[in-house]
């Protein structure tokens, strides 16, 4: 019996396919996944940066540094994403917060970053 899930959009299907290829080690697919989602990553990071600029400044991070960290979040999300978990961008949002926490507070932290 099929679950009542909303139908995937073309963008979600593209993200899922590119993430699967990137997880299998396809560097070109990872680059394409980054290009397709770069605008989303920048918007998410800018929202965080506007609210938490003092945190970023104290860690010595500019907005462009955070965008570079965003690439690592895309890589992490691609390697750990499963289509059963929902949309790739939702998973990527959590990966971005994880990467921000790592970049601003270090590898092992229990701090709350909003």
Predicted feature descriptions by range:
Residues 1-110:
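Alpha-helical promoter-recognition and RNA polymerase-docking modules of transcription initiation factors
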Residues 112-114:
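Short, intrinsically disordered, charge-balanced linker/junction segments flanking boundaries
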């Amino acid at each position: 019996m099929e679950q009542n899930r909303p139908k995937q959009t073309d963008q979600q299907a593209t993200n899922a396919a590119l993430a699967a290829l990137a997880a299998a080690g396809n560097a070109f697919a990872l680059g394409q996944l980054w290009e397709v989602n770069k605008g989303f990553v920048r918007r998410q990071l800018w929202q965080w940066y506007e609210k938490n600029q003092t945190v970023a400044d104290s860690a010595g991070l500019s907005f462009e540094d955070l965008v570079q960290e965003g690439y690592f979040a895309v890589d992490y999300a691609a390697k750990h994403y499963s289509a059963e978990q929902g949309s790739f961008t939702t998973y990527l949002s959590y990966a971005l917060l994880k990467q921000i926490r790592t970049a601003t507070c270090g590898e092992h932290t229990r701090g709350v970053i909003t």
